[in-house]
Amino acid sequence: MLQAFQHRRWSLVLLWILIVAAIIAAPAVLPVFRLNLLGRFLSLAIVALGIDLIWGFTGLLSLGQGIFFALGGYAMAMYLQLNSSADLPNGIPEFFSLYGVDRLPGFWEPFHSPVFTLIAIWLIPAVLAAVLGNLVFRNRIKGVYFSILTQAALLVFFNFFNGQQKLINGTNGLKTDVTQLFGQMVGSPEMQRGFFWLTAVVVILALSLIHISEPTRRY
């Protein structure tokens, strides 16, 4: 049994070495399009880690994990919209004119700041998760009821966001195909590699935090 455990341990070590080697080699061997695609897969891996944490260690299947990912995405999208709208006559995103809105809604204003945006990307989902988690676990909701509740929460948020045409463009979503970000050309190979490395580092940090956190160390 001990030998089997050691074999499994070394197999995992070898697997991690191969994964890290592939990540390091990817920017050198992949074209920009493929690298961008791999970066998107890695960002979705962060969501998968969240599902793995709560399902694998507590047995609770969350069907609403996309809520928190989407909130962070909307925060970044709002900054990108404002960044790309700076040269417009009224200085607000184009979609507002479709609904007769001629002034930027107040809650959009802080997203002119990249610092505020980066904080909001982490803080808004965390606060919502804390509130929902407190309500769920205080009432000891578990099993299939937990899954149904999280799926219902996802549908509530989905319908709410889709209905906010005048505020966040509803079903059409927010345009994020900007040409510049933080003064750099988004489409340049250097920026694409930077995005990839940033995403890879966040995935590794998230995985490391899961493994060193107190609840998971018991396993």
Segments predicted by a language model, with ranges:
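Transmembrane alpha-helices and adjacent helix-loop boundaries
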Residues: 1-218
